[in-house]
Amino acid sequence: MPSIKRALISLSDKTGAVEFAQTLHKLGVEILSTGGTAKLLADAGVPVIEVADYTGFPEMLDGRVKTLHPKIHGGILGRRDLPEHVAKMEEHGIGNIDLVCVNLYPFAATIAKPNCTLEDAIENIDIGGPTMVRSAAKNWKHVAIVTDPADFPAIAAEMEANNGALSDKTRFNLSRKAFSHTAQYDGMISNYLTSLSDDVLSGTPEIGEFPSQFNQSWIKVQDMRYGENPHQRAAFYRDVYPAAGSLSAYKQLQGKELSYNNIADADAAWEAVKSFDAPACVIVKHANPCGVAVAADTLTAYKLAYATDTTSAFGGIIAFNREVDGETVKQITDNQFMEVLMAPKFTAEALEIAAAKKNVRVLQISLTTPLEAGANRFELKRVGGGLLVQTPDIYRLNRADLKVVSKRQLTEQEWNDLMFVWNVAKYVKSNAIVFGKGGQTYGIGAGQMSRVDSTRIAARKAQDANLDLNGACAASDAFFPFRDGVDVIAEQGIKAIIHPAGSMRDQEVFDAADEHGIAMVVTGVRHFRH
């Protein structure tokens, strides 16, 4: 492993640059640099050589040409193991560059700014940076490329332990990371440019939601033992820039490694529970809520959610949107087996009690952002040979948007109950019917091909749980195609229904509500979930 003798450092994100450069200097490495990076290092007392001085060619064209020079790229691309390369480099006075530390212009931050113009975006497309990164990554056997400041400490430590050298394994891993970095960067540029409206040459073109070519990058978090079933292989990836408060930001505090199904179910539970403002508990099984409740505290919320369907809750995923205390965890572990327990925070006592169930996965995820800020920009669904892309369903109803279509008006408690069951229905697989009262689900009918069957299942679930539906409320994620669903709901003693409307037989459905003395509210918004 030959020692690194010369490094080129040119950074947009300069985190840790000074400390890393100081280590290189102590190891006798000559440092080349440009612009702001050179000034930063020089001001910190690190000897640097400006690239313009090294090449004998000035920086020009407003900084567009700085490192695009044979003395730079020859020094990076030249193979030390080929005599003809070595001879040519000596002939033209090109020295080896053994380490390249480069990250790229902040294109993502630029286009995220309000009123970003096309010119602003174009000027933040890096040219020299990716060229150096790709050159160094291609020649990884002889050159190390560092694109992530988070790698500086490990690289410095390895060099200090090996007389300034890096192993083949390290250089190859850095090369792979570098090519991923430039691929993600170019994909982001492509997405932006192909999203622009037809008036692209105007000063501030409108950015469409869906580019004509869709490029996306993810980072592997873990390989899994298997996928949805044992004969399927699987891995979990996260976004390069994951939304704050999203599942991929989890910190696992205890328990076995998460499985494919654990993650799918945990995501369903987390998305549902964080949609509530009041303290809430959501219990999920096979990506469907089987019990949901809001209450004054986590213990009460859990007891109410669990009471909805104690059978289905077994082996479920349990999520809270508030700090969980020891009393709550004690109640859960006394009641049931669970796969995953999730919350923004746990007390020390809660973690101590959970530790007695060593196989339970305990996940902590910060909830400091509004629901909208914690949502993915896109939801993706693979189909044969293609990809469906849509914006997330984060629509939140305001009471002012709702329309009462029945003769009977609603009590204040019924309004509150309708808003609760409607929010739950949004997270239940279609066709979805949810019964509830007092911030507690009483019955959930999910995933049936006919809406009336989901209605009957919700009624049976409430009956099995000995929950009295008299005076309860019902939500349907889509319109009732016939009055039969309303008739079944009326048989249970339910007094208010919320649904989108939009059926050819809406009037028939409205009339059925009036016949039964049921208050009916329509939303005009559907929440299909497949």
Swiss-Prot record:
UniProt keyword terms in alphabetical order: Hydrolase, Multifunctional enzyme, Purine biosynthesis, Transferase
User: Superkingdom, according to UniProt?
Assistant: Bacteria
GO CC term, one of those recorded: cytosol
Query: Which GO BP terms, alphabetically?
Result: 'de novo' IMP biosynthetic process
The chemistry this enzyme catalyses reads: (6R)-10-formyltetrahydrofolate + 5-amino-1-(5-phospho-beta-D-ribosyl)imidazole-4-carboxamide = 5-formamido-1-(5-phospho-D-ribosyl)imidazole-4-carboxamide + (6S)-5,6,7,8-tetrahydrofolate; IMP + H2O = 5-formamido-1-(5-phospho-D-ribosyl)imidazole-4-carboxamide
Q: Which NCBIfam families match?
A: PRK00881.1, purH
**Family membership noted in the UniProt record:** Belongs to the PurH family.
Descriptive protein name? Bifunctional purine biosynthesis protein PurH
Gene from which this protein is expressed: purH
